[in-house]
Amino acid sequence: MGDWMTVTDPGLSSESKTISQYTSETKMSPSSLYSQQVLCSSIPLSKNVHSFFSAFCTEDNIEQSISYLDQELTTFGFPSLYEESKGKETKRELNIVAVLNCMNELLVLQRKNLLAQENVETQNLKLGSDMDHLQSCYSKLKEQLETSRREMIGLQERDRQLQCKNRNLHQLLKNEKDEVQKLQNIIASRATQYNHDMKRKEREYNKLKERLHQLVMNKKDKKIAMDILNYVGRADGKRGSWRTGKTEARNEDEMYKILLNDYEYRQKQILMENAELKKVLQQMKKEMISLLSPQKKKPRERVDDSTGTVISDVEEDAGELSRESMWDLSCETVREQLTNSIRKQWRILKSHVEKLDNQVSKVHLEGFNDEDVISRQDHEQETEKLELEIQQCKEMIKTQQQLLQQQLATAYDDDTTSLLRDCYLLEEKERLKEEWSLFKEQKKNFERERRSFTEAAIRLGLERKAFEEERASWLKQQFLNMTTFDHQNSENVKLFSAFSGSSDWDNLIVHSRQPQKKPHSVSNGSPVCMSKLTKSLPASPSTSDFCQTRSCISEHSSINVLNITAEEIKPNQVGGECTNQKWSVASRPGSQEGCYSGCSLSYTNSHVEKDDLP
């Protein structure tokens, strides 16, 4: 497809020149032709179309267009449109047959191209639809892959959980097997122990049977009796049986059975009596603890050592009751514990009653306020309540006794009772061991408390001795300071001691019967002391000494005042305790004399309680 210039005749117009130049300069190719055909087909059919096609070939450039077409067709492999000329100078002529054949071939090619184009378009549509289908399938498969991955992850997690559960179950199974093995070993050991105990019991039973047989036979041999010469027949007229080995063995068995039944009956009665006594003692102990339970004290009352010991004893007994049950112990340990606890409670009750008596006597003689003393009506009400509680307790004890009798009335077989007793022997042994260790600990604690109590008693004795020495020196000084003696104003006021012959001045009684004279005063507000001693010489053994000591204290000082009044002391009662002893000490708060007197009184009361124990 060349760039060639056509030779135009000079007669051609300018328009044909431009067309020939355009066609000669452009590169013509089948693709360009096809594009031109498409463009031509796309142009709407109008007058411009006719003008466009007529612009290529006109009447002026027919030869040029034919030559151009011939050249193009030859380049595409079509035969030439001109006939072959014989001479060079002769003009070539147009071959119409060749032109028609070329046109036909061009039309065939056009149809083929159109069919191929349609086929390509249909194939393209098919491929597009296939592509869409494949894309949809791809998206679906991708979603299925994601879901399958999620399901696989869930299944893996579930598999892991199941494996963990399986491992735990294997571990539990192993533990259960170990526990079963341990239990089997324990059962085997207990079975061997039970067989051993059974054999031991059988040996003991055989020994006891032999011992009983020996005792019975020895009694028969040693028994002094008379032989009957003329045997009197039986009342029913039957003849007595001969004594043979079988009859003697049968009689011995019957005798053993009768003896064993008697022993069992007696043992049941003794057990019933022990149970009843245990219940009665336990009820008594509970009632005593409830009676002696520490009440709320008034703020005016002072707490002394004796009340502290009472509260501690009650708390210890309550702790013992909650710690162990009396029914599980043996008779000896129960008896010892109950007797000790009842003795303690009895001491506490005795001291409590003595304190109440002392309080009542103090109220009557010293004129305390009615608020600090229990009234008679309250006392009677309390006694009535206690009587009602005692009646209720008695009824409860009766009902318990009836229930116990009903339970024990149901007779059990000897074999079952023996088996039950044998079963509980091991538990009783273990319980006894534990109780023995607890008893040892209690004994150690008791010894420790006893040592501390003895040390406290020794300290109290030393303090008391020092106080007695100080008081003796003070009394000696007061006695030496006595200067005036007045025999006319002496009254029947007698000095005595609660324990005559001892130096227990805490039990002295203070009581002034008549108003005393005013003491002499000293200038500048100094304390004035006036002491009068009236002494009458004994004319006969029945006369007694009269003494009055009075210490007068200045208005500005607040020291202790001790007024002493004594009753007549008989000569034959020297060294013994005096009756109707009352004491009262009016002291300021913080005075040492009142504290020492209270300590000595509690100490003497505790000694009296120990001496009065049953």
From Swiss-Prot:
Protein keywords: Cell adhesion, Cell junction, Cell projection, Cilium biogenesis/degradation, Coiled coil, Cytoplasm, Cytoskeleton, Nucleus, Phosphoprotein
Residues recorded with modification Phosphoserine: S290, S293, S312, S536, S540, S542
Disulfide pattern: none
Tissue: Widely expressed, with the highest expression in brain, intermediate expression in kidney, testis, spinal cord, liver, heart, lung, skeletal muscle, ovary, fetal liver and fetal brain, and little to no expression in pancreas and spleen. All specific brain regions showed intermediate to high expression, with highest expression in amygdala. Also expressed in fetal tissues, mainly in liver and brain.
Signal peptide positions (record): none
UniProt record, GO biological process: cell adhesion; centrosome cycle; cilium assembly; intraciliary transport involved in cilium assembly; regulation of cell motility; regulation of Rac protein signal transduction
Parts forming coiled coils: 131-227, 266-293, 374-460
Superkingdom of this protein's organism: Eukaryota
A GO CC annotation given for this chain: centriolar satellite
Residue ranges, annotated region (Disordered): 292-317
GO molecular function (one): protein domain specific binding
Entry-linked InterPro entries: Adhesion_Centrosome_assoc (IPR052300), Afadin/alpha-actinin-bd (IPR021622)
Cellular localization per UniProt: Cell junction, Adherens junction; Nucleus; Cytoplasm, Cytoskeleton, Microtubule organizing center, Centrosome, Centriolar satellite; Cytoplasm, Cytoskeleton, Cilium basal body
Miscellaneous comment text of the record: Acts as an acute myeloid leukemia-associated antigen and may be used as a potential immunotherapy target for leukemia.
Comment on protein domains: Both the N-terminal (up to position 79) and the C-terminal (from position 304) sequences are required for interaction with SSX2.
PANTHER family referenced in this protein's UniProt entry, alphabetically: AFADIN- AND ALPHA-ACTININ-BINDING PROTEIN
Known role: Belongs to an adhesion system, which plays a role in the organization of homotypic, interneuronal and heterotypic cell-cell adherens junctions (AJs). May connect the nectin-afadin and E-cadherin-catenin system through alpha-actinin and may be involved in organization of the actin cytoskeleton at AJs through afadin and alpha-actinin. Involved in cell movement: localizes at the leading edge of moving cells in response to PDGF and is required for the formation of the leading edge and the promotion of cell movement, possibly via activation of Rac signaling.
Family: Belongs to the ADIP family.
Description of how the protein assembles with itself and partners: Interacts with afadin and alpha-actinin. Interacts with VAV2. Interacts with SSX2 and SSX3. Does not interact with SSX1 and SSX4. Interacts with PCM1. Interacts with WRAP73.
Protein name as it appears in the record: Afadin- and alpha-actinin-binding protein
Organism of this sequence: Homo sapiens (Human)
Gene name of this polypeptide: SSX2IP
